[in-house]
Amino acid sequence: NPDNSLAHRTTWLRSDFSKPDGTDWSVAVQDPEGEEGSYMGVINLSGTACVSTSGDYEKYFIQDGKRYHHILDPSTGYPSESGLSSVTIICPDEGEWKQDAGLLSDGLSTACFVLGAEKGMELLEEYGMEGVFIDKKKQVSVTECIADRFTLLHSEYTIN
């Protein structure tokens, strides 16, 4: 596990991302292809924010050799086939979103998962939010404002 990190194991996490000594916290991003507790990257965050992740790797079942996850595409009624494995959203817990940052980050992580990386990044830009998108080919897309705060930990992944 990364030193001085918050392991993001819940649907969403709210925290003041400054430690008592004033340094940033590191939020670990789960490796969707790895064992539970293995991380593919970390995001260093300061300030107060809510962080949410939607992924296809924890809640699923296999029937007739096909894997079905829990994130449904409302246009088909079936599990999303956006090509993504995981989407992590960072929503500042301040300004106009202060009261609803947790709900917004959770909703946006699911919406962006269904939309796919390109449309999901566009949606985040409209809302002024940040995110990390991981696709099935282990390609990672990171929004511009947190690109310098994201560290890739796993050599099998590449950043777009």
Kindly give the residue locations of the regions a language model identified.
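Mature catalytic core of soluble alpha/beta enzymes
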Residues: 1-160
